[in-house]
Amino acid sequence: MASATRVIQKLRNWASGQDLQAKLQLRYQEIAKRTQPPPKLPVGPSHKLSNNYYCTRDGRREVVPPSIIMSSQKALVSGKAAESSAMAATEKKAVTPAPPMKRWELSKDQPYL
């Protein structure tokens, strides 16, 4: 249709009842638009769009050693003497979710297992 003369174009438009030439440039409406909205990135080490160098957006650099939440041993504060052993004996033990498991024993009747 693009190579048809104006007379043929007018004849085609009149026969079809619509302007066929106006539709040529918009025949693919599912094509993405030229201006795209900025991306919506989740907040994280690389959530900034600019001024975001590779060394600062690398998540491995934000990893730190694990912090001790609870310890069964009491840590001594520097500059203070150790407290009495009676105080250490009354210290509470860590709470466990279940009683300790019994030690497994090997079967006596089948020594090959």
UniProtKB/Swiss-Prot annotation:
Main location: mitochondrion
Region (Disordered): 80-113
Bias-annotated ranges (Basic and acidic residues): 102-113
Subcellular location: Mitochondrion inner membrane
Modification N6-acetyllysine occurs at: 40
Biological process according to GO: aerobic respiration; ATP synthesis coupled electron transport; proton motive force-driven mitochondrial ATP synthesis
Domain of life: Eukaryota
Cystine pairs: none
Swiss-Prot/TrEMBL keywords: Acetylation, Electron transport, Membrane, Mitochondrion, Mitochondrion inner membrane, Phosphoprotein, Respiratory chain, Transport
Chain positions with Phosphothreonine modification: 96
Membrane topology: Peripheral membrane protein
Modified residues (N-acetylalanine): 2
Keyword RNA-binding: no
Assigned GO CC terms: mitochondrial inner membrane; mitochondrion; respiratory chain complex I
PANTHER family listed in its UniProt record: NADH DEHYDROGENASE [UBIQUINONE] 1 ALPHA SUBCOMPLEX SUBUNIT 7 (PTHR12485:SF1), NADH-UBIQUINONE OXIDOREDUCTASE SUBUNIT B (PTHR12485)
Family: Belongs to the complex I NDUFA7 subunit family.
Function, as annotated: Accessory subunit of the mitochondrial membrane respiratory chain NADH dehydrogenase (Complex I), that is believed not to be involved in catalysis. Complex I functions in the transfer of electrons from NADH to the respiratory chain. The immediate electron acceptor for the enzyme is believed to be ubiquinone.
Subunit field text: Complex I is composed of 45 different subunits.
Name of protein: NADH dehydrogenase [ubiquinone] 1 alpha subcomplex subunit 7
Annotated source species: Mus musculus
